[in-house]
Amino acid sequence: MNELEQWRKDPLVIKLMATEEVFWLNPHIDSFKSAVRKLSLHEDDVKDAEKRLDRFAPYIAKVFPGTNQAHGMIESPLVQIPSMKQSLEQKYLQPITGNLLLKCDSHLPISGSIKARGGIYEVLKHAEQLALQHGLLTVQDDYSILDSETCRDFFANYSIAVGSTGNLGLSIGIISAKLGFNVSVHMSADAKQWKKDLLRSKNVNVIEYEDDYSQAVEEGRREAEQDPTCYFVDDEQSQDLFLGYAVAAFRLKKQLAEQKITVDESHPLFVYLPCGVGGAPGGITFGLKLLFEDHVHCFFAEPTHSPSMLLGLLTGLHERISVQEIGLDNRTEADGLAVGRPSRLVSRLMKPLLSGSFTIDDDKLFTLLKELADAEGLFLEPSALAGMLGPIKLVQEGNHYLKANNLAEKMNNATHIIWGTGGSMVPEEEMMAYYRRGGTIK
């Protein structure tokens, strides 16, 4: 019997195969001090990324006026959601002890999703390297000089390619086109039409596939290999994407301090992150662990039809197993999470850092979307709601984790952050269709 056949008999895998919601605790999590010694990336790598984003801030502020107030910083609000907390408590008959906040990457400037972090960072890094090599820039310069015909004409000699289910493609497409690059976005069958239309309106070459995300990435990679002037943003194994996301943790630390929210041994922090291929939630988890070590507890949320990271970590097969191999179709309305196989880089980095993962049914994404809109006036896209039930599931199904980590008696002092990953770019009529659908599901 091969390894895959053995795993198909595992009780949790049987539930995954039946598209039942599951809650999984990672048995491989290690203390941060022990885990960090085995990791291939370190705090200096994240600080280097943060400094690069700071250098680009004058350019970003100049070409994206929506970032002016933040002086070219691509950042999102951290907000309390007390009415949503009350709504969840009443619906699930479960008190949520401690603070409940929403990190509104749904409202990040430029591309309206978490992918504005890693995607834009990686393109900026590539642009910086080219400009430095060809004498268009020094690191002492004001980077707003890149907003010139000379620089755009220079970047037009180069191209960028990416495979995406949607939001990463938006981020890469928008920033690459703004700099002057030729850019191709290879999009999978589940990518939303409005995302393709928006990219085409910005002169981005959109190539569509009948198949899923993995094929789109593979085709993008193949295109880049055939053209020495083409740079491929590899969502499955890019360190630069990962580090761009990790910077978010350093920004979040400042926001928590501004709101006088303490994170220490007596005040645990729980963060719930939607997960597709893993780059964004993995990078943020890595950054948070660097800062808060064992006082932060990160959980990934995935659709019941696409639990690729959970499956890879549970089996220890990482990117060597896909959800299709256990009979799942990888079809979900949470388009950004429709990934059948996890990132090789991220799944291995998460093995000692991640507290656990859970899955959520598509219908619940829509009911939560409507509930959040009604309670707080905040509209997120379906995939961005994947983590919303994390605090409920943690208490109902993760009590063992709380006891094992001496957290049960500290929960009154806990802070729960739901990472809202996208939504502000969704066309109004599309968002209202989501909202109405949330009202029809019983």
Swiss-Prot record:
Its cofactor is pyridoxal 5'-phosphate. The keyword Lyase applies. Pfam families: PALP. One of its GO terms (biological process) is D-serine catabolic process. Keywords: Lyase, Pyridoxal phosphate. SUPFAM superfamilies: Tryptophan synthase beta subunit-like PLP-dependent enzymes. Signal peptide: none annotated. The modification N6-(pyridoxal phosphate)lysine is found at residue 115. It catalyses: D-serine = pyruvate + NH4(+). Its EC number is 4.3.1.18. GO terms for molecular function: D-serine ammonia-lyase activity; hydro-lyase activity; pyridoxal phosphate binding. PANTHER family: D-SERINE DEHYDRATASE, THREONINE DEHYDRATASE, MITOCHONDRIAL-RELATED. NCBIfam families: D_Ser_am_lyase, PRK02991.1. Belongs to the serine/threonine dehydratase family. DsdA subfamily. This is Probable D-serine dehydratase. It comes from Halalkalibacterium halodurans (strain ATCC BAA-125 / DSM 18197 / FERM 7344 / JCM 9153 / C-125). The lineage of its organism: Bacteria, Bacillati, Bacillota, Bacilli, Bacillales.
